[in-house]
């Protein structure tokens, strides 16, 4: 599934995007973001992140730097705030 989605984005980049004016208001571009999101988070969550990014593409959003969030390690509880599990 990941390969199909990324393949679709690459087809867009090769056959459509290169023939349109560069108007992306974000870095990285939405297509590059989509590929990275799918590679990092898998087909389902990556697609969700890509769609969410594309939905920001309108004149009322300032754009700018918008990187794919890192994948959270399921065993990493560094963001966990409950102190009940921590022993000193």
UniProtKB/Swiss-Prot annotation:
Name where it's found: Cell membrane
Keyword Cell membrane (UniProt): yes
Give the start-end ranges of region Disordered.
65-88
Q: Cite the InterPro entries for this sequence.
A: Membr_insert_effic_factor_YidD
Query: What GO cellular component term, any one, is given?
Result: plasma membrane
Locate the compositionally biased regions of type Basic and acidic residues: 69-80
Alphabetic keyword roster: Cell membrane, Membrane
Describe the function of this protein: Could be involved in insertion of integral membrane proteins into the membrane.
Which family, according to UniProt? Belongs to the UPF0161 family.
Query: What NCBIfam families is this protein classified in?
Result: membrane protein insertion efficiency factor YidD (TIGR00278)
> Could you tell me which PANTHER family the record lists for this protein?
MEMBRANE PROTEIN INSERTION EFFICIENCY FACTOR-RELATED
Could you identify this protein by its name? Putative membrane protein insertion efficiency factor
């Amino acid at each position: 599934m990941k390969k199909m989605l990324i393949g679709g984005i690459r087809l867009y980049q090769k056959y459509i995007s290169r023939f349109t004016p560069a108007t992306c208001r974000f870095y990285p571009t939405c297509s590059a973001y989509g590929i990275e999101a799918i590679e990092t988070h898998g087909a389902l969550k990556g697609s969700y992140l890509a769609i969410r990014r594309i939905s920001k593409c309108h004149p009322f959003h300032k754009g700018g730097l918008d990187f794919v969030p890192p994948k959270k390690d399921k065993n990493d509880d560094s963001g966990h705030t409950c102190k009940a599990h921590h022993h000193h």
